[in-house]
């Protein structure tokens, strides 16, 4: 029997202290089949107790425990008797809070790969892992004295206390980031915490998520009406099908053709969602309106905000025509939230689904995918019976091609990106790489260069190709596309797309870059 309340699952709570990786901790635990969610560090012991979790994880963070305004935790949490794992800042905070512990500024800061030595045969989290292993460090402070009752179980060259444990109280700390894939045995460490220490049961699944969200949506919406903004991407499409399953005709979807869509996208969206699933979709042609607002604007943040605001204004106008629309649904994902910044994390970039919303918005928000990563959203789509060609469409940002034209947006520039992106996707699919490469698209950097075509001099645009491999979009590496495939793509773009004479390939990972250029 499907579960419809989070209390029905064994869960591990992650407290947010500001690390850009904190969502990954939640994701890793969920990968084990254990429900997990990220909560503010201001949560009280009583609030945690009411949730009945199997354990707690303190995330990393940018603060020093000695900073004014540094994030703290309710000390009563340590009296709940629950297993706690502190990661990086989380370990330092645990040490700072408990008696006998000491944290100091490091003489030699560690950022990146480091080797640790596991010094105890009874190190619970390191069971069945090598005595020497590579981990991912990112810290300027370190623990110089473990709290009373703790044993030091791992060290590194620049960090004499790299891991600690108090088995009796089920308290554990690691100075490195087990959630990052650069830590060789990170999954093993987190798995030992979830199952050996917390004794959690793997009873969480996507089927449960669907049932839980449907019940939650019905309870929140009641008999009211919901307006959904379809962007043409995977996320909003999945939200549309999920909402339709939950509330049927109470959902009206607005598909705004803002002139920033990919080639043939508008027709594909209408055919897939209106035709197959029966969604009630109103298509709005707002191309001239959006391009007029964006004229002369080069700053990427301004472009995002303008596009977000225009979307809401269009929705407001359509809602007025429809009468009684109280809710606005969006396809916001976990990665959107973290990159837009939380109360603890710095903003990397504002997302259309998060940062572009005006303060006087007339709708109540519904974001059913807010706790999911991209691949989880795809899994959800498949579980809902959506066709694979729709579920596996390339990720597409809310602002569309507006952030793939670097600088000022014009119709001519959009056409270059639209046509070149179509060629890229076509050749990647022909090569059988469309499921191997996580995301791929073209971008117009706004650079012109000299070329020779037809024995004549040209001075035309450069098109950039961005292709990455990833699991969840939080970290990514550039895809190693075979040279012959890249050559075909390059030749076709230069020959078939007007005003282009040069192709470049982005070979940067995330971090330091983001996947999108803007």
Curated annotation (Swiss-Prot):
**Is the keyword Disulfide bond assigned to this protein?**
no
Which pathway does it take part in?
Purine metabolism; GMP biosynthesis; GMP from XMP (L-Gln route): step 1/1
Q: Which residues form the signal peptide?
A: none
Q: What is its EC number?
A: 6.3.5.2
Q: Which GO terms describe its molecular function?
A: ATP binding; GMP synthase activity
- Which transformation does this protein catalyse, written as a reaction? XMP + L-glutamine + ATP + H2O = GMP + L-glutamate + AMP + diphosphate + 2 H(+)
The superkingdom of the source organism is Bacteria
InterPro entries (UniProt xref) = Class_I_gatase-like, GATASE, GMP_synth_C, GMP_synth_GATase, GMP_synthase, GMPS_ATP_PPase_dom, NAD/GMP_synthase, Rossmann-like_a/b/a_fold
The GMPS ATP-PPase domain is annotated at 204-393
Q: Which residues form the active site?
A: 88 (nucleophile), 177, 179
Domain called Glutamine amidotransferase type-1: residue spans: 11-203
Task: Explain the purpose of this protein.
Answer: Catalyzes the synthesis of GMP from XMP.
NCBIfam families in the cross-refs: guaA_Cterm (TIGR00884), guaA_Nterm (TIGR00888), PRK00074.1 (NF000848)
Know the name of this protein?
GMP synthase [glutamine-hydrolyzing]
| Organism, scientific name | Lactiplantibacillus plantarum (strain ATCC BAA-793 / NCIMB 8826 / WCFS1) (Lactobacillus plantarum)
């Amino acid at each position: 029997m499907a579960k419809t309340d989070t209390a029905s699952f064994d869960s591990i709570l992650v407290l947010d202290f500001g690390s850009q990786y904190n969502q990954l901790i939640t994701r890793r635990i969920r990968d084990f089949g254990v429900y997990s969610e990220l909560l503010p560090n201001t949560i009280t012991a009583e609030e945690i107790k009411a949730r009945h979790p199997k354990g707690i994880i303190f995330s990393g963070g940018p603060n020093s425990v000695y900073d004014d305004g540094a994030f703290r935790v309710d000390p009563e949490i340590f009296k709940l008797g629950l297993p706690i794992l502190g990661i990086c800042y989380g370990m330092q905070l645990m040490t700072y809070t408990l008696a006998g512990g000491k944290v100091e500024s490091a003489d030699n800061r560690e950022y990146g790969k480091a080797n640790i030595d596991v010094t105890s045969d009874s190190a619970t989290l390191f069971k069945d892992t090598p005595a020497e292993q590579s981990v991912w460090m990112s810290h300027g402070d370190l623990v110089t004295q473990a709290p009373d009752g703790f044993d030091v179980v791992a060290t590194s060259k620049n960090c004499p206390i790299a891991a600690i444990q108090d088995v009796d109280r089920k308290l554990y700390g690691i100075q490195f980031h087990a959630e990052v894939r650069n830590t060789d045995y990170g999954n093993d460490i987190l798995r030992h915490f979830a199952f050996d220490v917390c004794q959690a049961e793997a009873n969480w699944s996507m089927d449960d998520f669907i049932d839980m969200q449907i019940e939650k949506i019905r309870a929140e919406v009641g008999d009211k009406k919901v307006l959904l903004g379809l962007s043409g991407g995977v996320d909003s499409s999945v939200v549309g099908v999920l909402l339709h399953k939950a509330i049927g005709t109470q959902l009206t979807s607005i598909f705004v053709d803002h002139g920033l869509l990919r080639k043939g996208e508008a027709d594909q969206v209408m055919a897939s969602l209106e035709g197959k699933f029966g969604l009630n979709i109103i298509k709005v042609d707002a191309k001239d309106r959006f391009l007029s607002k964006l004229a002369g604007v080069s700053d990427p943040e301004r472009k995002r905000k303008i596009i977000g605001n225009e979307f809401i204004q269009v929705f407001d106008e359509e809602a007025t025509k429809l009468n009684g629309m109280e809710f606005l649904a969006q396809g916001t994902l976990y990665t959107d939230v973290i990159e837009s910044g939380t109360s603890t994390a710095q903003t990397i970039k504002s997302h259309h689904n998060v940062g572009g919303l005006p303060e006087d918005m007339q709708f109540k928000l519904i974001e059913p995918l807010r706790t999911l990563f991209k691949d989880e959203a795809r899994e959800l789509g498949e579980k809902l019976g959506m066709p694979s060609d729709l579920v596996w469409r390339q990720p597409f940002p809310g602002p569309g091609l507006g952030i793939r034209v670097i600088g000022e947006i014009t119709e001519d520039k959009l056409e270059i990106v639209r046509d070149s992106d179509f060629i890229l996707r076509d050749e990647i699919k022909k090569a059988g790489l469309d499921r191997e490469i996580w995301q791929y698209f073209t971008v117009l950097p706004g650079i012109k260069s000299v070329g020779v075509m037809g024995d004549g001099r040209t001075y035309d645009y450069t098109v950039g190709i961005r292709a990455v491999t990833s699991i969840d979009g939080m970290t990514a590496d550039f895809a190693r596309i075979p040279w012959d495939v890249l050559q075909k793509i390059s030749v076709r773009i230069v020959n078939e797309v007007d005003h282009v004479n040069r192709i470049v390939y982005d070979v940067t990972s995330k971090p330091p870059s983001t996947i999108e250029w803007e």
